[in-house]
Amino acid sequence: FLEKLSLLWLTGSIYPVQESFMSCLIRQKLMVAIEQLPFPSGKNLRKFILYLPEGERQELSVLFMHYLLKSRNIQVIYLGQDISINDLRDACKFHQPHYLFTMITEAFARESVQSYIDKLSENFPDAQILLSGYQVIAQPVQAPHNVRILNSLDQTLAMVS
């Protein structure tokens, strides 16, 4: 649905305000669904931090990931949009996640996607970093040892199962 919505917007078949309205409705539904899930419980739970890097605003896919993870009894901390590496470092010091997940759909203005991936790997050597999004999939990026590129929803679902 979201891909069709984006395609309609790109081809001028709908107005940006219509796409924004639909995105807000979907966001609200996802937030309610996430809140209705029980808080993960048990020993040795996997812990994820989800976030969007600086300049990223397309959060529906990350919210969907939040829902998928929490529905599988996985602890999730969603930091939100426009998160700097420094802020992410502070959050990781406090929460000590096993995994970091983000999506990179917009082109970075200040640095290359490869440079950003390398910084993530260097700054968070103890976490498994999971990346997806158009900019990561469409470009030939080199994934360091602790970085995994998720090319599809099927790959993502297999990883969280």
Positions of PLM-derived features:
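C-terminal regulatory/effector modules of DNA-binding transcriptional regulators
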Residues: 21-22, 28-161
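Long amphipathic alpha-helical segments
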Residues: 1-36
